[in-house]
Amino acid sequence: MSLSLWQQCLARLQDELPATEFSMWIRPLQAELSDNTLALYAPNRFVLDWVRDKYLNNINGLLNDFCGADAPQLRFEVGAKPASSLQKGAVSPAAAAIPAAQVQTARVAPTIVRPGWDNVPAPAEPTYRSNVNVKHTFDNFVEGKSNQLARAAARQVADNPGGAYNPLFLYGGTGLGKTHLLHAVGNGIVARKPNAKVVYMHSERFVQDMVKALQNNAIEEFKRYYRSVDALLIDDIQFFANKERSQEEFFHTFNALLEGNQQIILTSDRYPKEINGVEDRLKSRFGWGLTVAIEPPELETRVAILMKKADENDIRLPGEVAFFIAKRLRSNVRELEGALNRVIANANFTGRAITIDFVREALRDLLALQEKLVTIDNIQKTVAEYYKIKVADLLSKRRSRSVARPRQMAMALAKELTNHSLPEIGDAFGGRDHTTVLHACRKIEQLREESHDIKEDFSNLIRTLSS
């Protein structure tokens, strides 16, 4: 029995799993076959537990498919594969089975013979300004389907900085939790290693620091500062657009940090390749580690966010009230929290109980604006324009993929962004049955997990309709 068995499993798993999941959880595994036992080595306990919980049945099923009654037993271990099992010049089984161009982790940083994370001697200078907000942690980040992968990736980076997911690139619309996760990673790293030099900043601060260094003839000090941190967390990297000198300096800083196994985490409001005004060589490097999207929170997550926020403020928020708010405000977490703050303030000022009628009154203008902005008619026009078809096509009986997929997308958006029932949505799409609408919604939900393009389309349309 040879390692080709694991390579066969990898090939099948790559076909069956979304690219991000495969890159994040399966690709880091190393395998060793011995005495009819397949040992899988995970880089840390977090990955081991996740793989065993989520993918154990998939892997066992593949082993049975390939080997039948002779299928090896499966064993999980934390750490690197024993040196005795490594053949000189051999590549990782995962790397051999997976063409780099097929996954989002298009390049894994090589192991550099340099001081690693745990033994870099601390420089005598300069003094580091962390700017990490201690209030933003993993514990108070509300997890849901829309952000589950992003949170898991961030947690793993906090536990193993400078490891497989370097850089980590988080992208999504405004107010979805990207900044919270940046701070949570910073806090997690410092909790693990109190003396770690972790620096968080907005990309504009990097530009300002560089300009100031040039003005003061202190560019070498600038380079030494940014290239000797243990973790650099930069928010809204899209603001580097058209700033050529800043991009040039960040390019060299990025390379220096990566070669030193120092962690880089970046956020943006869009996918790396879609950032205009940024050099291709930088955009390429942004995708070298792991790229994960954060989508607008689904209804259940929005309710959970409201309940947690109310609990943090010692406010009793009835479940039906949280549901009422969450059903009507859908674009992002910041909008939800702002609405709840207004409700709480009004309740404190008036001494009234928080009920649905009270919330309807307190948020009257916000709710009216939301209902005015997002209608089925508006969704149909926006989707038709996005896919370059006619609204009449969405209402027609045509079943070609070029029309059917946009129609399904529009139906799913109508369910997500309006209060209309399934029969009402069906009527608005040429008198279709509610079961057709339900099928469309489920199909788009499935495709969002399997296809990066569909996930991007959905997020872009949500952002357009909610802005």
From Swiss-Prot:
Classify the source by domain of life. Answer: Bacteria
One Gene Ontology BP term is: regulation of DNA replication
Where it mainly occurs, coarsely classed, is cytoplasm
Q: Which UniProt keywords apply?
A: ATP-binding, Cytoplasm, DNA replication, DNA-binding, Lipid-binding, Nucleotide-binding
Q: Spell out the residue ranges making up region: Domain III, AAA+ region.
A: 131-347
Q: Which cellular compartments is it found in?
A: Cytoplasm
Task: Give the residues the record marks as binding ATP.
Answer: G175, G177, K178, T179
Which residues lie within the region annotated Domain I, interacts with DnaA modulators?
A: 1-85
Keyword set includes Manganese:
no
Please state what the annotation says regarding this protein's domains: Domain I is involved in oligomerization and binding regulators, domain II is flexibile and of varying length in different bacteria, domain III forms the AAA+ region, while domain IV binds dsDNA.
Q: What does this protein do?
A: Plays an essential role in the initiation and regulation of chromosomal replication. ATP-DnaA binds to the origin of replication (oriC) to initiate formation of the DNA replication initiation complex once per cell cycle. Binds the DnaA box (a 9 base pair repeat at the origin) and separates the double-stranded (ds)DNA. Forms a right-handed helical filament on oriC DNA; dsDNA binds to the exterior of the filament while single-stranded (ss)DNA is stabiized in the filament's interior.
Q: Which NCBIfam families match?
A: DnaA (TIGR00362)
The family classification in the record reads: Belongs to the DnaA family.
Query: What protein name is recorded for this chain?
Result: Chromosomal replication initiator protein DnaA
- What species does this protein belong to? Klebsiella pneumoniae (strain 342)
